[in-house]
């Protein structure tokens, strides 16, 4: 999936995974009770922050990585009919294998 958003510095654009809609026992979960997803796919990565010498510090993730991120990290944005999450690199907890 390609998007026309370019993140700045160490920002990362993530397409959030869908929240669970049904429990293991078959009960449907109403929208207001769904857990906020903490994983998704990286769609775009900024060039990284600059250190004191002005050199770029590379970001550890790349486009296509499946990541786990902080539950309250990031900013949800709605752009061209789609929902995205913009997070800082420090809010990425792990790359899923």
Curated annotation (Swiss-Prot):
GO terms for cellular component: cytoplasm. It is found in: Cytoplasm. Gene3D superfamilies: GroES chaperonin. It holds the Pfam family Cpn10. Keywords: Chaperone, Cytoplasm. It comes from the Bacteria. PROSITE patterns: CHAPERONINS_CPN10 (PS00681). GO terms for molecular function: ATP binding; metal ion binding; protein folding chaperone; protein-folding chaperone binding; unfolded protein binding. Its main location: cytoplasm. Transmembrane segments: none annotated. CDD domains: cpn10. InterPro entries: Chaperonin_GroES, Chaperonin_GroES_sf, Chaprnonin_Cpn10_CS, GroES-like_sf. GO terms for biological process: chaperone cofactor-dependent protein refolding. Together with the chaperonin GroEL, plays an essential role in assisting protein folding. The GroEL-GroES system forms a nano-cage that allows encapsulation of the non-native substrate proteins and provides a physical environment optimized to promote and accelerate protein folding. GroES binds to the apical surface of the GroEL ring, thereby capping the opening of the GroEL channel. Heptamer of 7 subunits arranged in a ring. Interacts with the chaperonin GroEL. Belongs to the GroES chaperonin family. This is Co-chaperonin GroES. It comes from Bifidobacterium adolescentis (strain ATCC 15703 / DSM 20083 / NCTC 11814 / E194a). The lineage of its organism: Bacteria, Bacillati, Actinomycetota, Actinomycetes, Bifidobacteriales. The gene is groES.
